[in-house]
Design a protein with these regions (language model features):
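N-terminal export and membrane-targeting signals
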Residues: 1-7
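Residue-level signal for mature regions of secreted extracellular proteins and peptides
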Residues: 8, 72-73, 156
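C-terminal motif of bacterial Sec signal peptides marking the signal peptidase cleavage site
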Residues: 11-14
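An acidic-aromatic pocket/loop used at catalytic or ligand-binding sites
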Residues: 16-56, 122-221
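Terminal, regulation- and interaction-focused segments at domain boundaries
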Residues: 26-45, 75-110
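Amphipathic alpha-helical segments
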Residues: 52-63, 99-121
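Short, solvent-exposed beta-alpha or beta-beta edge segments that form flexible loop/patches at the rim
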Residues: 58-79
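Surface-exposed patches in mature extracellular/periplasmic domains of secreted proteins
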Residues: 68-72, 117-126
Length: 221
């Protein structure tokens, strides 16, 4: 997309061509404009598309110190179409240390431009945590939302696919859940993977903005 924001409304220090704050540019989950039969299959999504979104997430995580927190598991789900063949993927919730919102916007925008994805931002504060967000998506309904929680001190990352078919020759006798999902460690081998929260729901100290910048990038948990 080639929407251009008015420089006077930008929070960035300099006007970035193509940067838009139009929340209407979001691609909602399962709301892709491409007909189901023409969308990528799960196999193509996992091998090609998901890694490109993961690259943008990694860029943000590196800026935040190279530590990526996880909360929950990645899973397959049924789509809102209620067609038994349609599936989507909700990846594990991810969190990184807080970075400057303008830096977050710029990194995500650059990743969107590099990959041909759509970009959107909501720069106005909302809620008690001073929430702001940045999102990147595509016409297949795939979506990654970075929620900048200034009041909580971290960035939450929601990573979802759009609706799709396991294969273009889907066989109901071959359950889609037999298609393995890569682990967070496999998707982000260059980042240090940690539990985002402890058993008391306290944020991992490695994800605090103070420690994140000093952690460096390491593989493994």
């Amino acid at each position: 997309m080639a929407a251009t924001a008015a420089c006077a409304s930008l929070l960035l220090a300099a006007c970035v061509p193509g940067l838009s704050d139009d929340a209407g540019l979001y691609f909602g989950r399962n709301d892709g404009s491409v007909p189901m039969a023409e969308r990528q299959t799960v196999e193509v999504y996992i091998s090609d598309t998901a890694p490109r979104y993961a690259g943008i997430i990694e860029d943000v995580a590196r800026e935040a110190g190279g530590v990526l927190g996880t909360d929950g598991d990645s899973r397959y789900g049924g789509c809102t179409t209620q067609d038994e063949a349609d599936v989507d993927i909700a990846w594990a919730a991810l969190d990184v240390a807080l970075i400057d919102y303008d830096d977050l916007r710029r990194i995500v925008w650059e990743g969107a431009q590099r990959n041909g994805f759509a970009y959107s931002a909501t720069p106005d504060y909302s809620g008690k945590n001073n929430r702001r967000s940045v999102a990147v998506g595509d016409e297949d309904g795939n979506l990654v939302v970075f929620t900048h929680l200034e009041g909580s001190g971290f960035i939450n990352i929601s990573f979802h696919s759009g609706c799709m078919l396991p294969t273009h020759t889907y066989d109901l006798d071959t359950p889609y859940k037999q298609l393995p999902l890569p682990s967070v460690e496999e998707m982000f081998p260059n980042l240090r993977i940690v539990d985002a929260f402890d058993e008391n729901s306290n944020l991992n100290p490695e994800l605090s903005s103070q420690s994140g910048a000093q952690s460096g990038t390491q593989s493994g948990s």
